[in-house]
Amino acid sequence: MKLLVFALFLQVVQLSLAQDDGKCIDMPKLLKKMQPAIDECGYKDAPTDQAKHDAVTCGLQKLGIVTQNKELVVQTYKDYLDDTILQHKTELYNALDECCPSGTCPAQDTFKCYHEKIDSVCPGDKQKPQ
């Protein structure tokens, strides 16, 4: 019995340590969901940072996360994030809601605000396509 309890304790510790690296989002999983649309927009062949940025915007538009007016659709973004969040889901969603209370806001400003709010909670997360 003691051995079983110890084994369970070790598993809990390992899971805690695995998520204690500052990461809140399983970025490989999220990017795997988004990458095809971003690649269709020419990300891999983009010669400049601006061209890469434009390809990401185009991909997010294809997915319905960003409108043609370059506004973030918060609920659609949450839907994409949902099964990729490892920890702090409430904090992540609250940050999105605080940065865009209307549900549709300028994407660049909203993402900047969002990342500033979650940086201390999720310092290990970086959102950049491969």
From Swiss-Prot:
According to the UniProt entry, its GO molecular function terms are: odorant binding; toxin activity
Q: In which tissues is it expressed?
A: Expressed by the venom gland.
Q: Which UniProt keywords apply?
A: Disulfide bond, Secreted, Signal, Toxin
Q: Where in the cell is it found?
A: Secreted
Q: What is its main location?
A: secreted
Output the PTM entry. Contains 4 disulfide bonds.
What's the domain of life for this entry?
Eukaryota
Record bears the keyword Secreted:
yes
Record's InterPro entries? Answer: PBP_GOBP_sf
Q: Which GO terms describe its cellular component?
A: extracellular region
Signal peptide annotation: 1-18
Protein name (record) = U-scoloptoxin(17)-Er1a
Query: Organism, per UniProt?
Result: Ethmostigmus rubripes
